[in-house]
Structures are given as C-alpha cells and as structure tokens.
Amino acid sequence: MAPVPEPINEMMAYYSDENELLFEADGPKQMKSCIQHLDLGSVEVGNIQLQISHQLYNKSFRQVVSVIVAMEKLRNSAYAHVFHDDDLRNVLSFIFEEEPVIFETSSDEFLCDAAVQSVNCKLQDREQNSLVLASPCVLKALHLLSQEMSREVVFCMSFVQAEERDNKIPVALGIRDKNQYLSCVKKGDTPTLQLEEVDPKVYPKRNMEKRFVFYKTEIKDTVEFESVLYPNWYISTSHPEEKPVFLGHFRGGQDITDFRMETLSP
C-alpha cells in the first residue's frame, strides 16, 4: 500500500515565504506557528481566520490552505478604535478605482426641456418713437399719438443661452402673440435685421440660434441690443420718422441705438 503523505508536509508544500509579505502587519512568526499546529477544518487565531479545504485530485488527498483576512480585525482590536472617515476611505480605495469624469456640453434636446424665462415689454427710442408693424414683416419707428398707442408692438423678451460677457444679458426678441422673432442675417456683405417666422412648437427655447440672440446692455435708464452673431452691430432707428428699424454699425449721429424699455405685467 502506498504511504499516505503527512498532512503537515503536504500543507507546507503549498506554503511560500511570499505569504509573509501579505500578513507582515500581523506578524509572520505567529502565522508560521499557527500553520504548523493546524488540524483539519477551520481555525481562527487572533485576527486571522484560516480555512482548510479538501479536494480529491489524482486519487490522492491534497489540502489547500486559504487565508482569509477577516473584518474582525477592526472589532477585536486590543484597544478601542473609533471608525473614522479615513478608515472608510482606505477600505473603499481597495474596492473602487478612481477614474476621471468627463462632462460633455449638453445638447439642445436637453436644454429645450428647461423653462425659458421671459418678460413682456415695449420699446421706444430716445426720440420717443414707438416700434410698430407697418406690414407683416416690416418694423418701423413712429411717433404715436395717445389714441394710437394700441399700435405699439409688445415684445416677448426671452432670456437665452449665449457666451457670458460683462453686464451683457443674452436675449431673444419675439413679437407677442405672433410667431416672429427679430433675427440678423447677411445680405451681400452687410448684416441686416429682419422679422423671421418660426415654428411655435420649437420656439422660444434656451439654446436659440445666434442670429436670434442679442446682448442687452443697460446704460443708465436706457438699453442697447447688440447682435451676438455680428458684434458691434446694434438694433437701430433713424431720426427721420417712418423708417424701418435696422441693424446699424454706428452709435450716435443719425443712428439711434438706445431705447427706453417699459416692462409690462404678465
């Protein structure tokens, strides 16, 4: 009959000095001593739990020693230890791996879900000319009599998304109760102002196209509207009455770029 290998000798064949590095904090000498006196089964010594499993392999017994570092190390310490944030951080650092989180710019489909804030207002230039619709797509500056004030256009000014600038608020100017917005387009080489028809199911929205967006700047008791698409071009009126509102490149002189704004209650 073939001799059965001694359990201790078979166990030590699977033991390596490298294991001492893993349990150096608990004392490698104590670890070796515990292994030399193990019986078959499961043993718990101090802070370390040892389990021995049996497996039949090639018609001979082999013992596999698995060393499990138990969480009892914290609870069975010889001294009272309060579990601090650093302890939890150390535990989690072994479980989770830190990775950078990259934030991408939100697309318009998400921005459109955000409510667009707006106010109703009327605009008069510094010469007290009111803005009126002379035709469905033509906006003019006229001096109105008191009985004609009902002709004055009411704007729905929406606060929209754009690159931030000091003391400049990005807005879009739509005509209330109409699907029309002031927009800036180029005709030839010159930026021009027009009234553009839009889809009421889509507009207004937070991320308006640049042609619809103006920087509103407050100067004392007046405001200016500068095109975002064409910097230094402003919504303007001219001194002669009944001229269309246009996009002007000059401030002062014949071009009037400053307006008094009257905010209306909802």
From Swiss-Prot:
The residues of the propeptide are 1-113
This chain belongs to the protein called Interleukin-1 beta
Do you know which Pfam families this protein is assigned to? IL1, IL1_propep
GO BP terms: namely:
cellular response to lipopolysaccharide; cytokine-mediated signaling pathway; fever generation; immune response; positive regulation of cell division; positive regulation of immature T cell proliferation in thymus; positive regulation of T-helper 1 cell cytokine production; positive regulation of type II interferon production
Keyword check for Secreted? yes
Cellular component aspect of the GO annotation: cytosol; extracellular space; lysosome
- Name of the coding gene: IL1B
Q: Which family does it belong to?
A: Belongs to the IL-1 family.
Q: Tell me which residues are marked as the site Important for interaction with integrin.
A: K168, K178, K187, K201
- Gene3D superfamilies named among the record's database cross-references: 2.80.10.50
Recorded hits in InterPro entries, A to Z, give: IL-1_CS, IL-1_fam, IL-1_propep, IL1/FGF
Q: What else is known?
A: IL1B production occurs in 2 steps, each being controlled by different stimuli. First, inflammatory signals, such as LPS, stimulate the synthesis and promote the accumulation of cytosolic stores of pro-IL1B (priming). Then additional signals are required for inflammasome assembly, leading to CASP1 activation, pro-IL1B processing and eventually secretion of the active cytokine. IL1B processing and secretion are temporarily associated.
Superkingdom in the source lineage: Eukaryota
Q: Which keywords label this protein?
A: Cytokine, Cytoplasm, Inflammatory response, Lysosome, Mitogen, Pyrogen, Secreted
Its subunit composition reads: Monomer. In its precursor form, weakly interacts with full-length MEFV; the mature cytokine does not interact at all. Interacts with integrins ITGAV:ITGBV and ITGA5:ITGB1; integrin-binding is required for IL1B signaling. Interacts with cargo receptor TMED10; the interaction is direct and is required for the secretion of IL1B mature form. Interacts with HSP90AB1; the interaction facilitates cargo translocation into the ERGIC. Interacts with HSP90B1; the interaction facilitates cargo translocation into the ERGIC.
Q: What is the stated purpose of this protein?
A: Potent pro-inflammatory cytokine. Initially discovered as the major endogenous pyrogen, induces prostaglandin synthesis, neutrophil influx and activation, T-cell activation and cytokine production, B-cell activation and antibody production, and fibroblast proliferation and collagen production. Promotes Th17 differentiation of T-cells. Synergizes with IL12/interleukin-12 to induce IFNG synthesis from T-helper 1 (Th1) cells. Plays a role in angiogenesis by inducing VEGF production synergistically with TNF and IL6.
Q: What is the lineage of its organism?
A: Eukaryota, Metazoa, Chordata, Craniata, Vertebrata
PANTHER family in UniProt: INTERLEUKIN-1 BETA, INTERLEUKIN-1 FAMILY MEMBER
Quote one Gene Ontology molecular function term: integrin binding
Q: Where in the cell is it found?
A: Cytoplasm, Cytosol; Secreted; Lysosome; Secreted, Extracellular exosome
Q: Does the keyword Cytoplasm apply?
A: yes
Principal location listed in the UniProt entry: cytoplasm
